[in-house]
Regions:
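Hydrophobic, well-structured mid-protein blocks that either form specific transmembrane helices
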Residues: 49-83
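Divalent metal-dependent phosphate-bond-processing catalytic cores, especially two-metal-ion Mg2+/Mn2+ enzymes
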Residues: 1-21, 32, 81-175
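Sparse recognition of residues in long alpha-helices and their boundaries
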Residues: 24, 64-65, 90
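His-Asp-centered metal-binding catalytic motifs of divalent-metal-dependent phosphohydrolases/nucleases
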Residues: 23-40, 44-48, 69-79, 97
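An active-site-proximal "capping" alpha-helix that borders the catalytic cofactor pocket
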Residues: 7-15, 43-59
Length: 175
């Protein structure tokens, strides 16, 4: 998890340098964004917000308004969120928390199906994988990238090409 937080921090700083934001806030948000995983995976984003609001050390460096902005940013960072992050800080951490690696995404989608839908046969898993990839990653999918400078822009385009090429997608699915 520490390595993940470092990667999110690096990617956050890369995105943030293009915008008028407070770099120290960006760094703190990246460091705190997943701390709520220690409490509960499903609501970790909300737990992370609570942790920020309750951390007395942050009050030494940030105003109450900045702390609230940081808490909201971590609450808004989930890729599956159904609403746009409330601030540029939320968009930065949401974007930086994504590491779009096309084949890994496909493999994780298949694995999730195997773990959570054991009753499906191979064709059922194929259809579930297709549905999920189209719903989330294809053109018009709910995954939103917020910054043109993000390395994810290129990676998402590569994933979309694979999704459009069902023969190639099927080969990856079959691995």
């Amino acid at each position: 998890r520490e390595e993940h937080a470092q990667l999110v921090s690096i990617q956050s700083q890369e995105i943030a340098k293009h915008y008028p934001v407070i770099q120290e806030m960006v760094y703190a948000i990246a460091a705190f964004h997943d701390l709520g995983l220690e409490v509960d995976r499903k609501t970790h984003h909300l737990e992370s917000g609570r942790i920020i609001r309750e951390d007395p050390r942050l009050r030494e460096w940030f105003s109450q308004e900045e702390i609230e902005t940081m808490a909201q940013a971590v609450e808004d960072h989930r890729a599956s969120s159904d609403h746009e992050p409330r601030s540029i800080y939320g968009k930065i951490v949401a974007e930086a928390d994504r590491f779009i690696e096309p084949e890994k995404i496909i493999e994780r989608t298949v694995q999730y199906g195997l773990d959570h839908y054991p009753e499906l046969d191979k064709d059922g898993h194929w259809r579930r994988t297709l549905d999920h990839l189209h719903e989330k990653y294809a053109e018009g999918g709910y995954l939103k990238l917020w910054f043109p400078e993000s390395p994810n822009v290129e990676r998402l385009e590569a994933l979309r090409k694979i999704i459009k090429d069902e023969t190639r997608l099927r080969r990856i699915f079959e691995k």
